Amino acid sequence: MDPLASLDFTKSGGLVTAIAVDDATGDVLMVAAMNEQTLRMTLEKGEAVYWSRSRGIWHKGEQSGHTQRVKSVWIDCDGDVVLLRVEQRGGGACHTGKRSCFFRKLEDGRWVDVGEQVFDPAKVYGR
């Protein structure tokens, strides 16, 4: 049986939500989208491949070297969310240079940056 048959790609125009979690710490690193093709590519490569609405197929870390080695794949009860437990390579998952895309915490009614800066995006992306 095809494992992707348990997923519902029809709810969001052919996409499912993908959550990347650090396998060692349990920290949420990022949320992205996947279509059937990129999920198959992820399973074949053993590295996270997402679908970007602006870029199309997006092999995470292909430009920066900050790839995500997939340790295990989980789906939710409705089959429309994929959880990837990953080994984050090269430091950061976020294009801002932070370890995680979730680095702003609401404290006393305002957003506070509590994230760890692990690389300089200007040096990595030339921006």
Q: What are the functions of these language-model segments?
A:
Residues D2-L15, V21-L29, M34-R127:
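C-terminal binding/interaction regions
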